[in-house]
Regions:
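A conserved segment at the C-terminal end of the G1
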Residues: 76-80
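Conserved AAA+ ATPase "SRH/arginine-finger" region at the nucleotide-binding site
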Residues: 169-179, 186-200
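AAA+/P-loop NTPase substrate/partner-engagement loops
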Residues: 81-114, 121-126
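C-terminal alpha-helical "lid" subdomain
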Residues: 2-9, 192-253
Length: 253
């Protein structure tokens, strides 16, 4: 596997299964001001990332919780804020986790700081990729690179699907394996479902940003109905509604 990345030109890349880094030309950066009700979560992430960039003590991070609540978007916000200080992001998919050793070897001595971003990370019973991740988070004989952190997102607190095998001793072995993976993330930040107020606040931001806030009051009930149909009041659903509104499709639904 031969990896290439022009770090000065590209702020982020995605590892492709065929064995190369796809450098990202366009990134949809997000400002921290756009997040609603996540002040504590943002403060924790920024403090850890600032410590990382300053060569101070820092830790790998697991962002877990409700879908569509901004976990992945926060990584883009971090990159937008800290790219000028040498931060770069490499995204890797679950099925490619076995390539982490080669990726570490490639990045270890580069004059940048890297967040390895694992999005929507969770494992079912028969999947074994988590063992590679568990080893390299803590357990390898080789020291973890000082210029790399892993930030992962998941809908599951413990990453592995809960199950008990009849061959386990009272089921404890499976639980221990499951918990051992999440334990390797010293900082676990939980994200919870938005309520009515937060949902409308996110939507209001969208209208303000597009200079059409005067239209917001007339559309709130439709927005609430849409969230009910989707079964969620997350920021993702609010932004989906806004796109439908702008396209005129919301009047047809």
């Amino acid at each position: 596997m031969e990896l290439n990345w022009e770090f000065d030109r590209y702020l982020a890349s995605i590892y492709r299964s065929s064995g190369y880094l796809h450098c990202i030309e366009e990134i949809e950066f997000i400002d921290f001001k756009e997040f609603v009700g996540l002040e504590k979560e943002i403060a924790l992430l920024c403090q850890n990332t600032q410590s990382f960039l300053s060569n101070k003590e820092c830790v790998n991070v697991l962002l877990w919780g409700a879908r569509g609540c901004g976990k992945s978007s926060l990584i883009k916000a971090l990159l937008g804020k800290y790219a000028k200080e040498g931060l770069r992001v490499l995204q890797i998919l679950k099925q490619d986790l076995q390539k982490i050793p080669e990726i570490f070897d490639y990045l270890r001595n580069k004059p940048y700081k890297f967040i390895i971003f694992c999005d929507d990370l969770s494992f079912d019973r028969d999947e074994k990729e988590y063992k590679v991740l568990k080893t390299f988070l803590e357990g390898s004989i080789e020291a973890f690179p000082k210029n790399i952190l892993i930030y992962a997102t998941s809908n599951r607190r413990h990453l592995l699907q809960q199950f008990h095998d009849e061959n386990e001793i009272f089921g404890f072995e499976g639980d221990e394996d499951k918990i051992a993976l999440s334990d390797r993330f010293p900082l676990c930040i939980g994200f919870y479902s938005y309520g009515h107020k937060e949902y409308l606040e996110v939507l209001a931001q969208c209208f303000k940003k597009s200079n059409i806030y005067d239209e917001f009051a007339h559309i709130q009930q439709k927005a609430i109905n849409y969230a009910t149909q989707k079964g969620s009041k997350s920021p993702r659903i609010a932004k989906q509604f806004f796109k439908l509104y702008q396209s005129g499709l919301i009047d047809i639904l």
